[in-house]
Amino acid sequence: MEYQYPLDYDWSNEEMVTIVKFYEAIEKAYEKGIVREELMGLYRRFKEIVPSKAEEKKIDKEFQEVSGYSIYRAIQKAKEIEEEKLVKM
């Protein structure tokens, strides 16, 4: 995509790579679909880096402003569907 991901420069390089992979998974959920377990695994890792609900909401808002994709909606949908199913927004 042609936009800049919201990143916190206090994160380590490894954490930034993990966060970018999570953003790419959200994009994939909207564009092609992604296996639920893959998305939820990346979300769990995201939550290890961003444990605060307030910070998660801030990042979601920033990501949605640049991409048009909602992290919250994608994760809610993933939580609602059965295992091994595709999350497709």
From Swiss-Prot:
Q: Which InterPro entries match?
A: BH2638-like_sf (IPR023324), UPF0223 (IPR007920)
One Pfam family this sequence matches: UPF0223
Top-level taxon: Bacteria
Per the similarity annotation, which family is this?
Belongs to the UPF0223 family.
Query: What's the protein name?
Result: UPF0223 protein BCAH187_A4080
